[in-house]
């Protein structure tokens, strides 16, 4: 889900609800400028902002941390843990190619992650 920075919190929440996703990538043209999440919506409401006329640009996470398509699951989980994020945009150069969330790792077997970590450490 991508939206422009002028989209409102209400519009973003509606689209996120329709698509059953927890985040929207905020784009200016083809450039990622931020991430808007359900947590950002709660924060905006807690501050007393009106979701009908509050633009995403004023409440989104600017210049979000990103990962590349060749990052490992461990890399993504470590970065989410270190930064306190639940969602990470995936950029190939400057082009948004996807998003990964903590939920994507639910049900992933710990053994498989440990296997990947061991392999990664042997490569490096």
For each of these PLM feature ranges, what is it?
Residues 16-19, 24-40, 80, 88-104:
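A glycine-centered beta-loop-beta connector
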Residues 2-20, 27, 67-84, 91, ...:
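The conserved cystathionine-beta-synthase
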Residues 4, 8, 17, 33, ...:
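Alpha-helix N-cap/loop-to-helix boundary motif
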Residues 1, 31-32, 64-65:
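Short active-site oxyanion
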Residues 8, 24, 48-50, 92-94, ...:
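Residue-level detector of solvent-exposed, low-hydrophobicity positions
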Residues 37-81, 99-124:
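Tandem CBS (Bateman) regulatory domains
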């Amino acid at each position: 889900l991508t939206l422009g920075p002028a989209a409102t919190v209400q519009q973003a929440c509606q689209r996120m609800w329709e698509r059953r996703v927890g985040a929207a990538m905020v784009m200016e043209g083809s450039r990622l400028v931020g991430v808007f999440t359900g947590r950002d919506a709660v924060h905006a409401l807690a501050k007393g902002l009106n979701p009908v006329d509050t633009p995403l640009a004023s409440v989104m996470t600017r210049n979000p941390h990103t990962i590349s398509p060749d990052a490992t699951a461990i890399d993504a989980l470590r970065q989410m843990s270190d930064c306190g994020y639940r969602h990470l945009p995936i950029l190939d150069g400057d082009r948004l190619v996807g998003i990964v969330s903590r939920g994507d790792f639910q049900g992933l077997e710990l053994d498989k992650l440990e296997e990947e970590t061991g392999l990664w450490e042997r490569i490096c």
